[in-house]
Amino acid sequence: MAGSDPGSRGSSPQPPHSDWGRLEAAFLSGWRNFWQSVGKERAAPRASAEEVDEEASSLTRLPIDVQLYILSFLSPHDLCQLGSTSRYWNETVRDPILWRYFLLRDLPSWSSVDWKSLPDLEILKKPISEVTNGAFFDYMAVYKMCCPHTRRSSKSSRPMYGAVTSFLHSLIIQNEPRFAMFGPGLEELNTSLVLSLMSSEELCPTAGLPQRQIDGIGSGVSFQLNNQHKFNILILYSTTRKERDRAREEHTSAVNKMFSVQNEGDDQQGSRYSVIPQIQKVCEVVDGFIYVANAEAHKRHEWQDEFSRIMAMTDPAFGSSGRPMLVLSCISQANVKRMPCFYLAHELRLNHLNHPWMVQDTEAETLTGFLNGIQWILEEVESKHAR
């Protein structure tokens, strides 16, 4: 709840080696700074004479720090509603410290982020005085840009002709969209995402058609979403089943045989990779990519290597440019603590990609979040074809 002491939250602190734990500590510090800042003397917006008369016994008579403290218990939606009631409240509810607090509080709990809504991490890590440099910084606009509810509302307000065009185009597509699925989350989790997909009644999995096989890879698995949208997933593992199982049992990383090293890197740069010929054939024919990331909070990552492999797979030299990529921020089960999807997006440097992407929180056991992600990438493919 807004206004609760962040230090009293139920989640236990992460061990010092956790990637997410370090930033989480910075976020909690940001929360504490908010409560300290509202206790300082601040200038309240000047209310008009009419507003003073109308609200003489209301919140406007309270000190501004008390007003902000009370406002922090409202939801962002309620704040926006309050701001529409008068000029005084329209200015007051835009307070940057208040909206920075909402960002710090809500951002880790949001289940998806995309290439249009990823916030700049620096504006959250730095003290507010360094971000604003004495000027007004619109944290309210940043919050609205990132908020999943706002994104859904914007999406639902698209012109109807766009949906009709996309639907008509889908009628003449001969083959269902094909996606290459890869990433450490396919192999490192205690619960197999692939086994959950294969047993899903909502997705109706069937074996791929033999005539559409790719040498050394297979034909993938065809699925049907909502009994109407068909798509095909080519599941790409880094190595053999035996080697993957051994690596998972020993908590080590198996040698990834999908890629060959072009240049050895160091701790800062990482290595550069290229895909092997069989994988290149996959990249040439797919309509998009599904990257399964291990989002369990205790996991240590080689972020630079993961980014380099994503870049190698999505190289536009192997297919059309602008193909979308869905990143499944995956954990085994609901009781496993996860790193927030926005943090994972930053660490994977997804803002450096030149094509649409979305990160979606997913649970391997229940497939929670998976259908939302698939629906997004199917819409992106249809939109691309319609253009």
UniProtKB/Swiss-Prot annotation:
PTM comment: the record says:
Phosphorylation at Ser-11 varies during the cell cycle. It is low in resting cells and high in the S phase and the G2/M phase of the cell cycle. Phosphorylation is decreased during late G1 phase. Phosphorylation at Ser-11 promotes homodimerization and is necessary for optimal ubiquitin ligase activity towards CCND1.
Going by the UniProt record, its keywords in alphabetical order are: Cytoplasm, Phosphoprotein, Ubl conjugation pathway
Could you name the domain of life of the organism this protein comes from? Eukaryota
A Pfam family found in this protein is F-box-like
For this protein, the record's SUPFAM superfamilies field holds: F-box domain
InterPro entries per UniProt: F-box-like_dom_sf, F-box_dom, FBXO4, P-loop_NTPase
Residues the record lists as Phosphoserine modifications: 11-12, 48
Q: Which residues form the F-box domain?
A: 56-102
Mention any one GO cellular component term assigned to this protein in its UniProt record.
SCF ubiquitin ligase complex
Q: In which pathway does it act?
A: Protein modification; protein ubiquitination
CDD domains (UniProt xref): F-box_FBXO4, FBX4_GTPase_like
Primary location class:
cytoplasm
Intracellular or extracellular location(s): Cytoplasm
Q: Name one GO biological process term.
A: protein polyubiquitination
**Function, in words:** Substrate recognition component of a SCF (SKP1-CUL1-F-box protein) E3 ubiquitin-protein ligase complex that mediates the ubiquitination and subsequent proteasomal degradation of target proteins. Promotes ubiquitination of cyclin-D1 (CCND1) and its subsequent proteasomal degradation. However, it does not act as a major regulator of CCND1 stability during the G1/S transition. Recognizes TERF1 and promotes its ubiquitination together with UBE2D1. Promotes ubiquitination of FXR1 following phosphorylation of FXR1 by GSK3B, leading to FXR1 degradation by the proteasome.
Q: How would you summarize the oligomeric state and partners of this protein?
A: Homodimer. Part of the SCF (SKP1-CUL1-F-box) E3 ubiquitin-protein ligase complex SCF(FBXO4) formed of CUL1, SKP1, RBX1 and FBXO4. Interacts with TERF1; this interaction is prevented in the presence of GNL3L. Identified in a complex with CRYAB and CCND1.
Q: Which PANTHER family match?
A: F-BOX ONLY PROTEIN 4 (PTHR16008:SF4)
- Return the protein name: F-box only protein 4
Q: Which organism is it from?
A: Bos taurus
Q: Which gene encodes it?
A: FBXO4
